[in-house]
């Protein structure tokens, strides 16, 4: 009898482990935290907007080559060419899916305190993407729920590096406000109404603007185009080629009322072709822009719609591991990045 005991025990143990493995995969909840984003999740995209799935590519290959085993010399796929420098630009990157051209201009802006014209440095980024999967919003928080009172701050640099970005700018300061719509990468994270005028990045890569007080978020997210991003800060600076602010317009919070400040502005030339400006301020050699000056400048670059993001000491432009501008916070001595709640990534 004893000689049958070991095989019996071993068989029961093996069977038990197999049952547990199935339960663990399908039923037993894990202890992992909820992750607020998935950079590889392209479920938002329809057949025409997103990158092709691997299965689709395989199916196409099988249709074109019904007898792959008969090919003695199959063609090798050419490696993607990536260009990382250009003589005409401060920074440059070009791949099949992303092109970023960065340069700096120095312009004259008005110092209304002293009634003189002063120099202001503006970093400009001309960005093209092949589809919206390369235009990402990313929170500083990794685990948990990204709402007011439960968030984590980090620098634009850290957020960009963690998101494997090539180019990034600071976001809309969602974490610093209790209300305001938040949609990132096709997912809704907050739908409480604020007084903000918002920017929506539609699923075809175009821009739209709307006021939260007049527009339920459900109306935006149910649009047939789909809402890929919704940023809540504002105001809109340019809409349909028209400047929407004047020299008296200013955000309701902030110290630079009607005067020069660091500005972060994102605009669109055409779907999937964007233009971004980050101006420096609070520096001896760079005074800053009013909202009207920021609108005039970016409109001169051919944008059709432009939107004001969180500026001031938060305004940061980052490229391939390097902060290009000199962020300056009035509450902190010296130059350095302010920790923020979110960033906009191109990858």
Which positions does each model-derived feature cover?
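Zymogen propeptides
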Residues: 2-193, 198
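Conserved hydrophobic/aromatic beta-strand scaffold that supports enzyme active sites
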Residues: 122-126, 236, 265, 343
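Short acidic-glycine loop/turn motifs at beta-strand connectors
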Residues: 128-131, 201-207, 211, 239-240, ...
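Short, glycine-/Ser/Thr-/acidic-enriched flexible segments
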Residues: 130-132, 174, 214, 244, ...
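Short, solvent-exposed aromatic-acidic interface loops
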Residues: 139-146, 214-217, 279-283
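Loop/turn elements at helix/coil->beta-strand transitions in domains of secreted/extracellular proteins
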Residues: 163-166, 206, 242, 271-274, ...
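Active-site-adjacent helix-turn-beta-strand microarchitecture at beta-sheet edges
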Residues: 170-256
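Conserved, well-ordered active-site substructure
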Residues: 178-201, 248-304, 309, 314-347
